Amino acid sequence: MENLFDINGKVALVTGGSRGIGAMIAEGFVKNGVKTYITSRKSEQCNLKAQELSKFGECISVPTDLTDMKEMDKLVRHIEENEKKLNILINNAGAAWGAPFDTFPENGWDKVMDTNVKAVFFLIQKLIKILESSGDNSDPSRIINIGSIDGIGIPRAETYSYPASKAAIHQLTKVLANRLANRNINVNAIAPG
């Protein structure tokens, strides 16, 4: 049982890996022998976090705005050109927006849905070949989407697009879990909060 959760030698990509939950996940991976790529829209912050985590193992910074499909394509190319496998994808990058109901702006929906839902779907789609080839029946690849309790219940804050986006992530996770299981890819979500 001592190797029940052994992840040494795996390769992971953690989006939004420069701070918060993403940084904690990346740190856990690096400290347990996982070659870990992290992304963030903020280049300097991403580079500094990768440098900090590299004290414990291998951590590579790939600054990326996942709402920009050209940048996403560059990220995918970077992974595919440098790795033979990608065992774990953590979709953690996210955005929130708060404003009163009567003045909640359209761009508050666009930014949040583009980051929290659309980018997750398209990143999985673009990485599907390497994820599929990295898994097998006994050790599938893993995709973990970071949802939120705000996507399950009613939040106190006036963040209308955020809970809607997290509810969408929970549902997208169920759909993808069903569709990708036969391709040796497990898809799950967690709901922090």
Residue spans for each PLM region:
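Residue(s) in the substrate-gating loop at a strand-loop-helix junction
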Residues: 148
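Substrate-binding pocket helix/loop in short-chain dehydrogenase/reductase
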Residues: 100-101, 105-113
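Active-site loop-to-helix junction immediately N-terminal to the catalytic Tyr of the SDR YXXXK motif
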Residues: 2, 104, 154-163, 175
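Alpha-helical segment proximal to the catalytic Tyr-Lys
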Residues: 129, 178-179
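The beta1-alpha1 cofactor-binding region of Rossmann-like NAD(H)/NADP(H)-dependent oxidoreductases
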Residues: 43-44, 63-74, 106
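Active-site helix of classical SDR
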Residues: 124, 165, 173
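Conserved glycine-rich cofactor-binding loop
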Residues: 11, 18-19
